[in-house]
Amino acid sequence: MLKPGDVVALDGDLGAGKTVITRGITEGLGLISEDVCSPTFTIVNEYTEPADKVPVFHFDTYRLSGEDDFIAAGLDEYFYRGGVCVIEWSSVIAGLLPKKTVKITILGTGSERKITIDDPEGRLC
């Protein structure tokens, strides 16, 4: 089970299902998931309702040029805000990810996909 401070890194092509996985994570944590959408232009969306649940901070780093952009925008501070961080296109900031990050890679789109989960602490597997 995911807990405050956990980071989930999602990588896959456009349309692979990264946002769908994020929707499942928010729902699994008891948050309202209908409004989950890719934060391509906002960079980060916060899902915090209901307030008694662990919040999810959902990032899309596709448009960032690298780790320096992430830090300059103060986005690394979300790692310490007591929520679960879910990061689409996480390879853009790979050097900033905590060692215990759950990494999910999605290969393919459409009806056939290969999903690989690297979960160093066994939270999901």
Q: Language-model segments: which ranges?
A:
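Conserved lysine of the Walker
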Residues: 18
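Short beta-strand-centered segment that lines the nucleotide-binding/catalytic pocket of NTP-utilizing
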Residues: 32-46
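Phosphate-binding P-loop
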Residues: 1-5
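Switch II (G3) loop of P-loop NTPases
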Residues: 56-64
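The conserved Walker
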Residues: 14
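Hydrophobic anchor at the beta1->P-loop junction of P-loop NTPases
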Residues: 8-10
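Short phosphate-coordinating micro-motif centered on Lys-Gly-acidic
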Residues: 65-125
